[in-house]
Amino acid sequence: MKKRFFSALLALVLLLCALPAPVHAAANEITVYNWGQYISDGTDDSLDVIKAFEEETGIKVNYLTFDSNESMYTKLKTGGTTFDVIIPSDYMIAKLISEDMLEPLDFANIPNYAYIDENFRNQAYDPENTYSVPYTWGTVGLIYNRQYVSDEDAESWSCLWNSKYAGKLLMFDNPRDAFAIAESMLGYSLNTEDENELRQAADLLATQKPVLQAYVMDQIFDKMERGEAWAAPYYAGDYLTMVEENPDLGFSHPKEGYNIFIDAMCIPKGCQNKEGAEAFINYLCRPDISAANLDYIGYSTPETAAKEYMDEEVISSPVSYPDDETLARSEAFAELSVEATQSMNDLWLSVKTSGSNTTLYLILTLAAVAAVILFFVISAAVKKRKKMRRCRKWKQA
């Protein structure tokens, strides 16, 4: 009886051992979802942050990227991939909190949070600092090629509507950032929910379309760096990297106003390794790591302690750290209501599709004209050939 009991017990133990470990037990692996080109990766003698973290902690990092807050949000909503750390912007964090999509952080596992400056804590998007830890802050401005675009023109967002530069202008390919530029030009808040003001912004964006080369996001980096475009809205931090490769590039904080933002590290609901995620967040907050990381990506640090490790050229740059007068023209995004967001999305779709019928009509018209010309050319050639044949026959006769 005892033998049968122990045999059954042994069989049960072996069966349990054979079962795959539950996903949450994978304490040696995390998946991070971040903006493109937004972490020091070891190129140009920089610190490979992910590799250094893996070697120090033994935790493997699966690293994926997105190109806008909206695409990141859609990915989280639709599922399919589980993330442990995400790095959205301020207004998107507020949206994720309101929809109960973030895990509260255990700050006992993030002692390096102590290095985050008070000015970056308890922000409106996360007033109790329950769900987020600041990663960087920065501004959106106008990047332009000084060989082709004057400094005077680049002082205003209207540069992106200037027909002198037609075909060489780029625009953000997402509604929130595109509308922000139009709203600044019209003197409206970047957070307006007024339907009339949104429509005016959409109308202004529609007038820009004929002079644009393309609506793009991350591609702005390469197109401006290679000189394929002459002016585009983009992030101050990236400009400092781009200008090293193309010294002809300039940067301005347009006089009408611009967006200032904080990107912060969060843990989404459904994460598989919360402790590993908090270890990663804590690692990025370590002043020497933060400094090495931000020295490379060019964005501004929310840690005074990190500046002690950073290049003087970076921390004294008016692009990365604007003066008070320049900062006074900035405005942070706030979460918009569902209704205002939907209205903006609908208007953006109308902007993107406007003129498509006219373009199609023009293409069809040109094709028809070309067909008619080709018909007459061929007809003339056939008639000429027949005439030559008749002439030969007449001579032979």
Q: What annotation goes with each model-predicted range?
A:
Residues 8-18:
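Bacterial N-terminal signal peptides
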Residues 92-95, 231-248:
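A ligand-binding cleft/hinge motif common to bilobed small-molecule-binding domains
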